[in-house]
Every structure is written in C-alpha cells, then in structure tokens.
Amino acid sequence: MESFVAMKVVCIILLFVIAAEAESINEKSDVEPSKGKNNSGLQFKFPPYVPNHKAFALRLLSLCEQGIYGTKINDLKVDFKNCTFLCIRKYENLTLPLPEDTPCGPNNQTCHKKDECVGYIPGC
C-alpha cells in the first residue's frame, strides 16, 4: 500500500514538471538566428548547411504537433538523405517528410529533389 501511495506522489510531481516545461516552451516560442545553439545552450546536431538550427527545429516541431499535446522531435533522427524526421508522440511515433525547401546537402541541395540529397552523420 505504501508503494502505491509513493507511486501516486511521483506521478503527481511528474505531471507538475511536464506542465511547467510545456508552459516554458510556449513562452520561448520566439525564433532568433543561431549558430546551432539556442538561448539555453542546447546545441542541435543538424548539419552546418542548415542555416538556423533553432528555427529549423521549431518548424519541425510545429509540423509534428498539429494539434497533439506532448510531441517532440529528436535532432539525431532527422534523415537528410531521405528527407524525413521522427515525430515522437505520447502513444505513437510518426515518420514525417521534411519540407521541400529543407537543405539536404552542402551544395545547396533541397528536399525538393530528394535524389540529390546526401546523408549526414553528426560530428563528421
């Protein structure tokens, strides 16, 4: 019985943390140019030919959400070769297409012509 009560307390605390995080995300929705980092020091793992990493991440997140609360993206699960990204949702994950104007190569390739896109390995 004690473990059940402890589990309830942990769940309630977790809900408060999630709610606070969601509210702080809404407050930080302004997009400013970055060089791979955002205001909190988080560095994205997108290739250097993506000009504004934070704006790109926010764009993918908005495509992913489309009315669903609790969605997120993983910058390591963006496939520039196939022009797709992983949308992580509470109950199921989806692989969605990147916008056609997304850079997908160092020579100004875009996802409009997927056959010209090149793979990217973070750190290489």
UniProtKB/Swiss-Prot annotation:
Expression induction or repression: By feeding. By the presence of Borrelia burgdorferi.
Stretch list, region CD4-binding: 105-124
Residue intervals passing through the bilayer: none
Tissues and organs where the protein is expressed, per its UniProt entry: Expressed in salivary glands. Detected in fed adult female.
Annotated glycosylation sites: 82, 93
Localisation per UniProt entry: Secreted
GO cellular component: extracellular region
Quaternary structure annotation from Swiss-Prot or TrEMBL: Interacts with host CD4. Interacts with host DC-SIGN (CD209). Interacts with Borrelia outer surface protein C (OspC).
Purpose of the protein: Salivary tick protein that downregulates host immune system by binding to both dendritic cells, and CD4(+) T cells. Specifically binds to the CD4 coreceptor on T cells. This interaction prevents the activation of the Src kinase, Lck, and its downstream substrate Zap-70, and results in deficient activation of PLCgamma1, the repression of calcium fluxes triggered by T-cell antigen receptor (TCR) ligation, and a subsequent reduction in interleukin-2 production.
Entry similarity comment: Belongs to the salp15 family.
Name of the protein: Salivary protein 15 Iric-3
